[in-house]
């Protein structure tokens, strides 16, 4: 049977947006086993939600829908208004500032709970720092990153 992940994702998202009363333009692009979906329209803040939680939830659901019928695993990345890149920059900046604080106060800093993707951004941002190290603790979905002196 002809399986088209882009079409599956689009059909699902159109139904969701229709139910929400939102008019959203959906642009999909598939590269290998990755499906990138960019959403444009008014009120995209509603789709982003607090710290991207709504966008993450929607991405999770699209992932389930696409992979239900896919013969191989497809990674789905949902974005709007360049939110993912902006969030990455915010998290990197936060990581650098908190690392400074740890060096100055010599006390650990525990960040708010984050999803694995966001925790990875923090770990990557500080991996080459000679004075601090990072690790994750806690149980999903409430795992947080701890920044500590080496």
Residue ranges and their predicted role:
Residues 1-150:
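RNA-contacting regions in translation and RNA-metabolism proteins
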């Amino acid at each position: 049977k002809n399986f088209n992940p882009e079409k599956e994702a689009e059909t699902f998202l159109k139904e969701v947006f229709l139910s929400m009363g939102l008019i959203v333009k959906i642009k999909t692009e598939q590269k290998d086993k990755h499906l990138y979906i960019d959403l444009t329209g008014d009120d995209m803040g509603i789709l982003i939600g607090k710290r991207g939680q709504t966008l993450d939830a929607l991405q999770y659901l699209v992932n389930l829908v696409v992979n239900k019928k896919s013969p191989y695993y497809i990674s789905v990345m949902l974005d709007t208004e360049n939110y993912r890149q902006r969030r990455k920059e915010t998290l990197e900046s936060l990581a650098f500032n908190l690392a400074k604080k740890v060096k100055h106060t010599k006390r650990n800093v525990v960040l708010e709970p984050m999803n694995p993707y966001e925790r990875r951004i923090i770990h990557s941002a500080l991996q080459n720092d000679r004075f601090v190290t990072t690790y994750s603790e806690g149980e999903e979905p409430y795992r947080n990153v701890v920044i500590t002196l080496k």
